């Protein structure tokens, strides 16, 4: 196990840059029951440093198997070539019964939750999130389109209105989390000075 590599990745993404832990803080605020409240890599370095090889292996064999894998292939290759190569490289891996996915549903949020963090960062930042439907729900694609309409490109609604016209933000973005279960619609921005 390359523990130090994972620790360095955690530091690089979460500790060594301004706002690096913003998504961790926001998820912990947005989710009270569902495991989405915890980052995959862990909440702190001790989670990585204290993980035993036995725990990592047990987790791997519980959740990682050909039975629940997805293979994405791109490039100049035919379907037949893809099948041949997939069978060659992945066919020998034995099937295993993986644990059924059983996660608690996040209760409906009925109140606003806020967290103010004061740090020495280059500029203030705003991170907001709103609960949205699961990825398999038909409305998921409407949220995806809405996030693009609001923040993709210089002519998008949020940039035109809040950055160019009102000049209350220097930058603003909207995006959705691609979660299997109910996800989040994010709005992030850097307010203009003053």
Could you tell me what each predicted segment is?
Residues 9, 28-69, 97, 101-106, ...:
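Histidine-acidic residue clusters that define the catalytic metal-binding segment
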Residues 1-2, 8, 19-46, 68-74, ...:
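M16 family metallopeptidases and their MPP-like homologs
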Residues 128, 138-150, 158-162:
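Active/ligand-binding-proximal structured segments within catalytic/core domains
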């Amino acid at each position: 196990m390359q523990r130090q590599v994972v620790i360095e990745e955690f530091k690089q993404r979460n500790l060594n840059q301004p706002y690096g832990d913003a998504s961790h803080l926001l998820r912990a605020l947005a989710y009270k029951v569902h495991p989405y409240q915890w980052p995959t890599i862990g909440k702190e370095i001790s989670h990585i440093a204290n993980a035993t090889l036995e725990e990592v292996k047990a987790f791997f064999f519980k959740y990682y198997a050909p039975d629940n894998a997805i293979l994405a292939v791109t490039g100049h290759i035919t379907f037949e070539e893809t099948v041949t190569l997939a069978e060659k490289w992945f066919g020998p891996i034995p099937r295993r019964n993986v644990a059924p996915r059983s996660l608690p549903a996040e209760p409906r949020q009925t109140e606003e939750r806020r967290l103010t963090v004061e740090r020495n960062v280059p500029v203030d930042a705003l991170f907001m999130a709103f609960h949205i439907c699961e990825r398999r729900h038909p409305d998921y694609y409407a949220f995806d389109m809405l996030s693009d309409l609001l923040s993709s490109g210089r002519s998008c609604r949020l940039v035109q209105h809040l950055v160019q016209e009102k000049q209350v933000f220097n930058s603003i973005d909207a995006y959705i989390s691609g979660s299997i279960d109910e996800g989040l619609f994010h709005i992030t921005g850097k307010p203009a000075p003053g």
